[in-house]
């Protein structure tokens, strides 16, 4: 996921990340149907990329986006839920990252990680992003720049 995006605000930037990781999951799914000898190695590399992208994205949300949103909106239960969802994602990511080679559970773990991610993205799009955009105390354009800067550091 590129650090610079054409999005106008923090929500647009985060959603661009969502779209990019969705594409990675789709690419992985296509590889699961491949009978090519190189498919296993490609799946492992793609899974590692997915894990990196999700780890950086979650860290950005937890360090920058969620704290700013927590100060700007009254209903913070959604933020608590989002952080719990991040922990579930991290648990699966940790399991995938310790694998030197895909085993019989590897594809299932990547698939479930994708499903968890899709659920999380849907909640952000339908609940968190509208609340963020409605919050008067939140400068989403400035927050976007903060996210871009932090992401560049994390991806370096």
Description of each model-found segment:
Residues 1-156:
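Small-residue-biased structural context
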């Amino acid at each position: 996921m590129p650090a610079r995006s054409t999005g106008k605000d923090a929500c647009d930037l985060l959603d661009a990340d969502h779209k990019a990781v969705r594409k990675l999951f789709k690419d992985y799914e296509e590889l699961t149907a491949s009978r090519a000898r190189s498919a296993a190695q490609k799946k492992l590399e793609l899974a590692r990329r997915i894990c990196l992208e999700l780890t950086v994205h979650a860290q950005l949300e937890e360090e920058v986006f969620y704290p700013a949103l927590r100060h700007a909106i009254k209903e913070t239960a959604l933020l608590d839920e989002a952080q719990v969802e991040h922990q579930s994602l991290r648990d699966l990511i940790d399991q995938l990252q310790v694998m030197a080679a895909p085993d019989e559970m590897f594809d299932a773990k990547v698939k479930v990680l994708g499903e968890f991610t899709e659920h999380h993205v849907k909640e952000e799009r339908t609940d968190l992003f509208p609340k963020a955009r409605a919050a008067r105390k939140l400068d989403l354009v400035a927050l976007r720049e903060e996210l871009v800067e932090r992401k560049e550091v994390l991806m370096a």
